[in-house]
Amino acid sequence: INAFGFTGRPNVDEGELKPELCYELNTFAPLKLSTICQCFNINYIHISSGCIYTNYEKEYNEYDEPNFGFFNSESSTYSKSKHAFEIGCDYGLTIRVRMPFCDKLHNRSYLTKIKKYDNLINLTNSKTYIPQLLDFIEQFVSEKIEAKDKDIVNFVQPNPLATDKVIELMKEYNLGNSEWSWVQFEELNCIANRSNCILSTNKLKNKYEFDAMDEELAIRAALNNILMDE
């Protein structure tokens, strides 16, 4: 189970400054691992990213050609490197996640980032609740499900929320930020473009028979656990 990769610090803009490292950790090293696993007939699960699509034309499924990936000159190095892995990999299960959040105020959690940011953009994006992702992966171990044939699955929560709704929930749980203000993306002076999209969960539900929590319920669960942990 491969969970390492390059996301950049503090964000994906670092990928534009360190493209070689970004490709090494997001493309070449995971491909080497998949080859080794294939040679030894070992199950391989690679945790990747759904940030290879953008815009709201549809809910993107696993069979849609990425429009914010390797072949789009406007996409970020991060997104290109994630798509490049999918192009090159012919073994194991690739799990696409987006904007992960968990039950703690971890500095890489979406909820922590939102709490700390003063400037917010109101967009709707698919997100991944890490405890449920771990439950999904654990099934492959405990039930000895094979992960050898090439496959891709989106693991995100159904019915994603816009940022303003997430803010309402955080305020409800007294985890707000008095400095929050709304801005446009252009005002942030980012180096790299960003992926904004909604991913389909039909394959997760129908093929893998996993019922992911609606995003609002997942966020409420996380916020409850954060409060209990404080």
Predicted features, each with a name:
Residues 1-27:
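NAD(P)H-binding glycine-rich loop region in Rossmannoid oxidoreductase-like domains
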Residues 3-4, 44-50, 54, 95-97:
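SDR active-site strand-loop-helix element
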Residues 17-24, 28-32, 51-95, 102:
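Catalytic helix-loop patch of NAD(P)-dependent Rossmann-fold dehydrogenases
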Residues 39-42:
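A short helix->loop->beta-strand "cap" motif at the edges of active sites that frequently abuts
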Residues 58, 86-139:
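NAD(P)-dependent short-chain dehydrogenase/reductase
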Residues 65-68, 98-100, 110-121, 174-185:
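A short C-terminal helix-loop "cap" of Rossmann-like NAD(P)-dependent dehydrogenase/epimerase domains
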Residues 136-196, 230:
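Mid/C-terminal beta-alpha module of Rossmann-like enzyme folds, strongest
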Residues 213-230:
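Amphipathic terminal alpha-helices
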